[in-house]
Amino acid sequence: MIAFIVLLSLAAVLQQSSGTVDFASESSNKKDYRKEIVDKHNALRRSVKPTARNMLQMEWNSHAAQNAKRWADRCTFAHSPPHTRTVGQLRCGENIFMSSQPFAWSGVVQAWYDEVKKFVYGIGAKPPGSVIGHYTQVVWYKSHLLGCASAKCSSTKYLYVCQYCPAGNIRGSIATPYKSGPTCGDCPSACVNGLCTNPCKYEDAFTNCNELAKETKCKTEWIKSKCPATCFCHTEII
């Protein structure tokens, strides 16, 4: 059976399906499938080539899942407004998948990851212009909070949404979604099954916080408020 599958943003393909699944049984509201989604992401994250020295372990986040569900239920094949994709102070990224028939969540996540076929670490999309953003979000080292949801939009349309916090796909860094090196090289004392478990709870407001922190030694309240990750997270993954 041929299933029409679309992955936001620009990819549209016809793909042979291995068979339909019961949509209700694949609901992301069920605890077993939440575990399936998280485990699939973590399995893919620990299998990246080249290996990653700073890849964080993902965990389920109910707030991100609620945000994903609200958007999935609107059955709009477009990204949700960025201001609706937040968990606390964290801004979240988003992957979207649409199919003409229900898919197992592991298959949805694998479809996003498979964009790796057109990705070269350190270079980016190859050939240039290829869609790789779903893959890079799945393996973005810093994204460690995950929430997903799905919706049956009609008899021929199923929408799957995952949100990732903090957001990946930072401009200028797409070609290096993680730091290559020995597995868990940046978290030797906080490594579980090849993934780091020590995320920094803060997020810097600026990309040049390292330079600012060196200049001020984090002694001003302004620097502490704008560069809290750099100032306070010395052993955690930033």
UniProtKB/Swiss-Prot annotation:
Outline the extent of the SCP domain. 38-164
Q: In which tissues is it expressed?
A: Expressed by the venom gland.
Give the matching Pfam families.
CAP, Crisp
Residues annotated as signal peptide? 1-19
Compartments where found: Secreted
Q: Which CDD domains match?
A: CAP_CRISP (cd05383)
What PROSITE patterns does the record point to?
CRISP_1, CRISP_2, SHKT
- Domain of life assignment: Eukaryota
Q: Write one Gene Ontology MF term.
A: toxin activity
Q: Which residue intervals define the domain ShKT in the entry?
A: 200-233
A GO cellular component entry from the record = extracellular region
What InterPro entries does UniProt report for this protein, alphabetically?
Allrgn_V5/Tpx1_CS, CAP_dom, CAP_sf, Crisp-like_dom, CRISP-related, Cysteine_rich_secretory, SCP_CRISP, ShKT_dom
Cysteines engaged in disulfide bonds, as pairs: 75-153, 92-165, 148-162, 184-191, 187-196, 200-233, 209-227, 218-231
Main subcellular localisation = secreted
Mind listing the UniProt keywords for this protein, alphabetically? Answer: Calcium channel impairing toxin, Disulfide bond, Ion channel impairing toxin, Neurotoxin, Secreted, Signal, Toxin
The protein's role, per its UniProt record = Blocks olfactory (CNGA2) and retinal (CNGA1) CNG channel currents. Does not affect neither depolarization- nor caffeine-induced contraction of smooth muscle.
UniProt lists the family membership as follows:
Belongs to the CRISP family.
> What is the protein's name according to its record?
Cysteine-rich venom protein
